[in-house]
Amino acid sequence: SQMIITNEIILGEDQNHLRDLRNELMGTGTYIQKAVEYLTEKGYTFQDTYTSTFVDNPTTWDIFAASTNTDAGIIGPTFDYLFAYDAEGVMQPRMAESYEISEDGTVYTIKIRPGQIWVDSQGRKIADVTADDWVAAAQHQADLQDCYDLNNFIAGMTEYLTGETTDFSTVGVKAVDDLTLQYTLKEPASYFISLLQKHAFLPLCRSYFLSQGGAFGQAEFAEAQAQPTYLYGTDQNHIAISGQFLCTNMTEKNSITYVLNENYWNAANATLKGVKYVFSDSSDVSRTYDDFINGVTMTLGLNTQRLELAKQKGDFDKYAYVGDVGRITFLFWFNLHRQTYANMADGAAPSQKTDAEKSVSCAALQNAHFRRAIGHAISRGAYLAQNVGEDLAMMSVRNTLTPGTYVKLDEDVTIDINGTATTFPAGTWYGAIVQAQLDADNVGVKVWDEK
């Protein structure tokens, strides 16, 4: 809802000015207004519908079963978070109004915004939003065996996942009353509130889920999911919606259309009133490029092919700019103790290696020097250049697995850095703390830049 959408392509120099303006006004609450004023002065006009592309049909409309960025991106507009960062990086209340933290830092009591409702894809009321919807969501994720974030933080979740208990009331997600939600953590995490804009902390309408053939309990859910009567998340017409948009049309490999949910809690103040995705698998480079230039779509990432096309047509110097690096990292893993050499489910696709070759590979991978040699031998810049070209290759290189903007402190925190008590104020990003420790260790590695 805080998107600024122009009818014209914004020039690269104006994009750079907007980025500098945002950095200057961070935390003041005035960036959106000032950005609109600047763009208006530059002759830009505005619209309220955002158009982008999708590369594949969603495999599910159950946000908690979504395992790809494509699925999550398509389902995302139909949900809203308890809290979320605004355009200036300030955490703002959304479906929640406020929160309190216990003295020991392990219990977060969250007040849910009253008057919110669940609707179907046509905007018809299904039920009131209550705190129990977050309890239902947590259990559904556990039943799906897909709750990494919850298991890391929430007390009792591990015991439920492993089957040590089947009683979900022992897990630290509780509805104190209809509008009071409570999370109990395994241990204090001063950045916990900043995690609440992750999908793991979205709600699920319990009554609607059950009406679509769902069930709670790991064994019960597995049985229900296998039945033809299980319909939840099979398409956009079989989910309950609490977010800003209704998906009114989904045409496979063609288009997806969203309109404003008039029952959304902040609909009256929404400046973004529509979203449309058009299909593009990027196989036709010229078409994808021309769609952007002609205003059919509003964003275009440059890979090596598009970069060359932009330079040929004289658009690169005019429109290109380097956007903010995202919050997702991609990495290589070593399988140090490989035990399986075929598909676990059915034994298909067995490895062709001999037992001797398997033994040699295992020994090599357990050698730290071998692993380091591979790590140093791989040029991340050269790898990225294959997709984005030499000029932009190093822009996306990170030296930490977890992005520096992953979480930020909700309160002042003092920690020990090599024997010195060091206080970081509320609002400090994770990356700044890591950099402070690295600097104290004289490591000489850059992982965080305040800019």
Per-region residue spans from a language model:
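Extracytoplasmic/periplasmic ligand-capture domains
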Residues: 1-10, 87, 113-146, 244-387, ...
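N-terminal hydrophobic or amphipathic helices and topogenic motifs
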Residues: 1-51, 85-92, 435, 442-448
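N-terminal lobe/hinge region of extracytoplasmic solute-binding protein
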Residues: 32-35, 50-104, 240
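Immediate post-signal peptide segment of exported/extracytoplasmic ligand-binding proteins
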Residues: 41-51, 241, 268-273, 368
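A structural "hinge/loop" feature
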Residues: 50, 54-75, 95, 122-127, ...
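Beta->alpha turn/N-cap motifs
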Residues: 54-58, 187-189, 301-307, 387-390
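Gly/Pro-rich hinge or "lid" segments in bacterial periplasmic/extracellular proteins
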Residues: 87, 188-189, 197-276
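Surface-exposed binding/hinge segments that line
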Residues: 111, 133, 143-221
